Amino acid sequence: MSEEQNKTLISAAKGGIVEAIKGVGDVAGALVDVISGTLVKTLQGTRAVGAEMTGLVKDTVTGTVQGVAEVGGEVGSAAKGIVLGTLRGTKEVGIGVLDTISSTSSAVIKSTAEVGGDVVTSAKGAVEGAIVAAKELGVSITEAASTATNAVIKGAHAVGSEVGHTTKAVLVGVCQGTKEVGANAMEAISGSASAVIKATADTGGDLASTAKKAVEGAIAAAKEVGIDVTEAASAAATGAINAAGEISASVGAQVRDAVVGTISGVKVVIQEPFKKEP
């Protein structure tokens, strides 16, 4: 796809969002329907495959974020609807759900930063949207949450956002999303904490500090949504340790030291056994 075609698609998505929001004044409601409809129309009318198809999705997300910003909407708060609408739209043309979650979550973070929006809030919303969509589409909620988490953590690093704050927000998004769809929060918390560590390792970040932030986020989120705080802390810590142990024994020990003990007033107990390097 040419650069001119990219600009046209971004402009079309932006225009559609602006008109829809002006017409109903409901940013959240307009987002899901407009982005879903735009993608169905665009993707059904193209022969694009693979990377080009992914590019079309990213351009649509970019235009949507720009549209929300233009009408004065809070881009961070709109992230959930953007991810949900994108996944509903791409479902109609058979694009893989997890691939779409990854590319969409990444595009949301990048576009949010470009318009000066709240990247941390966008990260939370992207994960929530991925979980809600996964429930609708019959995909593993834990895999969806982990995929979105990996994408937003890497995205936050790429745009220079504070990864620690993003990590905490992601865990809040996991707990709120699983509560909304009635899913097992502990599995998703553990999976997302693991994804945080893997993404942080890939970007050269501080694994011990990030692991602790993940546990702090799980604790804060558990209190907010009314689930067992100790279990949530344990799930996050165990997920982080398992992922770190897959990198190396020394990294696993480093992360374990960071998350064992009392964090945010909660005694963190690890779910044994966790994976160790031979």
Segments and roles (model prediction):
Residues 2-278:
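Extended, low-complexity, charged alpha-helical tracts
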